[in-house]
Design a protein with these regions (language model features):
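Beta-propeller-forming repeat regions
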Residues: 1-358
Length: 358
């Protein structure tokens, strides 16, 4: 019997139905996508780390665009330089050294793994927490609880320069804030020293049966929605950013089995957040995000104009909850970074240049 050698050919050109060539037909398609900014080739320009939760696939795109132009080139070689990612990924520069670090889910522990970016001549990461990120409760340090079904918010919530974490707690429908104490204790942001700050950030609660939001709750003086005795349904996504230019972070919230993002606006103070109103048709009544299930949002500069744009895709990896040809929605920011105005551009960002067989 003869022998055969199989050779991968990824340079075969493919055209779409309009007879236009696809830029990266063999990248493998996209389904339930998460997008992060990361300088992959160390040229000082943010590229795209894309993560498909269906299959835990890493797809890397080099930024080739000029100012005001979105132009990306798929480059598979960088995927092997990215640490293992499971279920979700967020890149933030937690130690303020100018390099984006990686936060991802810790399989088996319902927690967070952190990889510090130690790139010099090549892209390189070092794991800095074992086996998971911890937070201080009154009884001592414990696992900072985040499930595989939730996408946490990691941002400077209190304005002191280090990265805090917002997520739903173990029980109940309230938002936990884990405050990073690095600046308070050490005078710099290079430590991951967390302390549970409040179990009811924003005075807001989510129904344990739907995506209904209850405002002005949790504490005396408000409508006490519910005790913490009943576990909520699992599955929510956070994007934490100032959306109305008042100096306070707001939330874009996605929820399992629901196709929208709700914008929750914070009108409280740095020390005591208070969600007082919300937009259920974000980012607009004629072009609101409306997917099969549970959008997750990314706030990144897609077209190199200095303004953060909005990318949304289903977080739920279920095969019936994303559509492989139009599951990455791109909204261009025509406003400001802390007061964005989003214009809908396409529902197939990057994936329109790929073959996806299912």
């Amino acid at each position: 019997m003869g022998t055969y050698n199989l050779v991968s050919q990824n340079n075969i050109s493919v055209k779409n139905s309009s007879n236009e060539p696809l830029k990266f037909p063999w990248a493998g398609g996209m389904n339930s996508m998460q997008y992060c900014e990361l300088d992959l080739n160390l040229d000082g320009v943010f590229d795209l780390l894309s993560f498909d939760r269906r299959g835990n696939r890493k797809l890397c795109f080099i930024n080739k665009g000029l100012e005001g132009i979105a132009d990306y080139e798929y480059d598979a070689q960088y995927s092997s330089l990215i640490p293992d990612i499971s279920d979700w990924v967020i890149t933030v520069d937690y130690n303020l050294d100018g390099k984006k670090d990686i936060f991802t889910y810790s399989p088996g522990y319902a927690g967070i793994i952190v990889y510090k970016n130690i790139s010099d001549q090549e892209l390189k990461f070092e794991r800095v927490v074992y086996p998971y990120l911890k937070t201080m409760f009154p009884g001592g340090y414990v696992n900072l609880f985040v499930t595989y079904a939730d996408y946490p918010g990691i941002a400077d919530v209190d304005g002191d320069g280090d990265m805090d974490i917002l997520t739903f707690g173990v029980l109940g429908s309230f938002i936990d804030m884990h405050k990073n104490m690095s600046m308070e204790k050490y005078g710099n942001a290079d430590s991951l020293d967390y302390e549970h700050y409040t179990y009811c950030w924003g005075h807001v609660a989510e129904s344990d049966e739907s995506n209904h939001i209850y405002l002005d709750t949790c504490f005396s003086g408000g409508k006490n929605y519910k005790s913490l005795q009943t576990p909520r349904h699992s599955g929510s996504t956070f994007l934490v950013h100032d959306l109305d230019d008042n100096g306070l972070v707001d939330i874009l919230l996605g929820d399992v089995e629901f196709p929208w993002l709700y914008a929750l606006y914070n009108t409280g103070t740095i020390d005591d957040a208070h969600i007082s109103y919300m937009d259920t048709l974000f980012p607009g009544s004629t072009d609101e995000i409306n997917m099969f299930s549970m959008p997750v949002a990314a706030y990144i500069d897609v077209n190199n104009d200095g303004l953060k744009d909005l990318i949304a895709s289903p977080f739920d990896p279920g095969i019936t909850n994303s559509q492989d040809k139009r599951s990455v929605w791109y909204y261009k920011n025509t406003g400001h970074n802390t007061n964005p105005d989003f214009e809908f551009i396409s529902e197939d960002f990057l994936q329109k240049n790929m073959i996806d067989m299912g």
